[in-house]
Amino acid sequence: FDGRNAAPSDKASDLISLAVRGCCSHPACSGNNPYFCGGKR
């Protein structure tokens, strides 16, 4: 079970981290999501 569940969740977290990185490069988006972007202003 663990081996089968690892791949989809890894793909999902990769997509999420890519989306978050894109968001954090935009001041308006990173300002609205400080917890995603390290909480830095």
From Swiss-Prot:
Record-given protein name: Alpha-conotoxin Lt1.3 b
Species name: Conus litteratus
Span list, region Ser-Xaa-Pro motif, crucial for potent interaction with nAChR: 25-27
Result, substituting F36A: Loss of inhibitory potency on alpha-3-beta-2/CHRNA3-CHRNB2 nAChR (Lt1.3-II)
Remaining remarks: Lt1.3-II (C1-C3; C2-C4): this synthetic toxin shows no or very weak inhibition on alpha-2-beta-2/CHRNA2-CHRNB2, alpha-2-beta-4/CHRNA2-CHRNB4, alpha-3-beta-4/CHRNA3-CHRNB4, alpha-4-beta-2/CHRNA4-CHRNB2, alpha-4-beta-4/CHRNA4-CHRNB4, alpha-7/CHRNA7, alpha-9-alpha-10/CHRNA9-CHRNA10, and GABAB-Rec-coupled Cav2.2/CACNA1B.
Subcellular location: Secreted
Family: Belongs to the conotoxin A superfamily.
Tissue note: Expressed by the venom duct.
Keyword Disulfide bond attributed: yes
A GO molecular function held by the record: calcium channel regulator activity
